[in-house]
Amino acid sequence: MAQAKSNRVAGNIFKGSVGNLIEWYDWYVYSAFAVYFSAEFFPKGDPTSQLLNTAAIFAVGFLMRPIGSLLMGRYADRHGRRAALTLSITVMAGGSLIIACTPSYESIGIMAPIILVLARLLQGLSLGGEYGTSATYLSEMASSGRRGFYSSFQYVTLVAGQMVALGVQIVLQQLLSEPDMKAWGWRIPFIIGAMGAVAVLWLRRTMDESEQFANIKSQKRESAGTIRALMKHPKAVLTVVGLTLGGTVAFYTYTTYLQKFMVNTVGLPKEVVSWINFVALLIFVVLQPIAGLLSDKIGRRPLLMAFGILGTLLTAPIFFFMEKTTEPIVAFLLMMVGLIIVTGYTSINAIVKAELFPTEIRALGVGLPYALTVAIFGGTAEFIALWLKSIGMESLFYFYVAGCIAISFITYWRMDESSKTSQIEAELGGGDNLVNNKSS
């Protein structure tokens, strides 16, 4: 009986996670292939300027994430985590197909970047809803005492989505010449992402719903998923903001911007940088469940404190050393130091946020303040870095990242140990964590 329940939990975690992988693959393909398609959507000119325009549109996608988290979070808290996750993957697939099919600037002029913006708005809407709902679902479905471990798979699949994007990039780099990549090869990964969503739609329709949501649905609470209900938890909302600020800036700096930094500032070949990123992210993925399991043993707060202290002290030195190196192995090792530090945040941030809120507003509570913070700070990190580089002050960005982490450290220092005050455990009272809710 216990084994059957464990298998059921693992199956639902897998179904929720693999959809998360496709969502983030579609999101990251844009960044991974920006160095190839940036010239397709903007007038010919300086490569840094084209990348700056592409990064600005990347940031625009982040601006839709709070709206997505508001709409999808409310939907998930009222109609179920499964229904919201199914809807989010459908919207993401649509955005990817639009990008894949959009003609170049030379063909349709200003309409090319306009359509690109619209597609990124759709993807931002989707991802905004995906994060909070996915974090909530994985946290609720996990077994008591293993929630840190199971919820860490949100970032396992999040980063795995980026790895798949990089893997596709590496394969295409081997098969196609650079002119072909810039002309049409960059469209292939967007088509792959849209096709992968079809399988995910089927998987997500067969997921079980959590017991927590089933209880809320049976009680028909009108306050479920409302801003009014969320505002009754101001401390939890502010904790999510403080928890996220430094973590999201550090995460996007090391996993998204660093690829461009190695090419444009360090001067390493694109193909070498792709391999460095792929191997580093593979190790990063393995670290997530290890750190998540550790948090089940020693608590969430020690990992966050380690990230806050080390991130504040070592971020600037890592970048100063990297910009002076010419050796790929040194660049790889420096990237790994950064990713190991960031693991203190990424591995457990989903469960920490989920443990702060009651079921009736958990998806909205996890998603909305997170999405607002990411839109303001995470989504603009790459743009700020490229802008500072364009005016010859790139090193200021290193201290900006360190400063953001320092602000979050104050939150980690002042917050309670969430595993000991978990709303999830308090509501469950030792009950099962899933129900077969396929008829709903």
Where in this protein do the model-derived segments appear?
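Extracytoplasmic gate region of multi-pass secondary transporters
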Residues: 31, 234-283, 377-382
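Extracellular/periplasmic helix-loop-helix junction of adjacent transmembrane segments
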Residues: 34-65
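Central cavity-lining transmembrane alpha-helices of secondary-active solute carriers
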Residues: 55-74, 93-95, 278-291
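Cytoplasmic membrane-interface "Motif A"-like loop-to-helix N-cap segments
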Residues: 78-90, 297-308
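C-terminal ends and interior cores of transmembrane alpha-helices
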Residues: 90-109, 309-325
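Glycine-rich segments within core transmembrane alpha-helices of 12-TM secondary carriers
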Residues: 149-173, 369-381
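Multi-pass alpha-helical transporter architecture, strongest
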Residues: 200-207, 352, 402-429
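C-terminal transmembrane helical hairpin of 12-TM major facilitator-type secondary transporters
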Residues: 302-348
